[in-house]
Amino acid sequence: MNVKTVKCPSCGKPVPWVPESRYRPFCSERCKQIDLGAWAAEQYTIPVVEEDDLPDAPGNDTSGKLN
């Protein structure tokens, strides 16, 4: 059987993608905690698109006028 592997997001070590891999996608509890700490310290961010930057779409009129 060919087992798929993924790289641990913290250290890059290969991790077999099977139910027995307790911390997947991480290789260990330590790498899992390092990643959680990075999120808690706001080292990772999710990009936000400002509403002014969104293209105009039909039905998205925010002027308050009714058609």
Swiss-Prot record:
Quaternary structure note: Interacts with GyrB.
Known cofactor(s): Zn(2+)
Positions annotated to bind Zn(2+): C8, C11, C27, C31
InterPro entries per UniProt: DNA_gyrase_inhibitor_YacG, Znf_NHR/GATA
Listed Pfam families: YacG
UniProt name for this protein: DNA gyrase inhibitor YacG
Keyword annotations: Metal-binding, Zinc
GO MF annotation terms: DNA topoisomerase type II (double strand cut, ATP-hydrolyzing) inhibitor activity; zinc ion binding
Family to which the UniProt record says this protein belongs: Belongs to the DNA gyrase inhibitor YacG family.
Role noted for this protein: Inhibits all the catalytic activities of DNA gyrase by preventing its interaction with DNA. Acts by binding directly to the C-terminal domain of GyrB, which probably disrupts DNA binding by the gyrase.
GO biological process assignments: regulation of DNA-templated transcription
Cofactor note: Binds 1 zinc ion.
Record SUPFAM superfamilies: Glucocorticoid receptor-like (DNA-binding domain)
Keyword check for Manganese: no
Highest taxon of the lineage: Bacteria
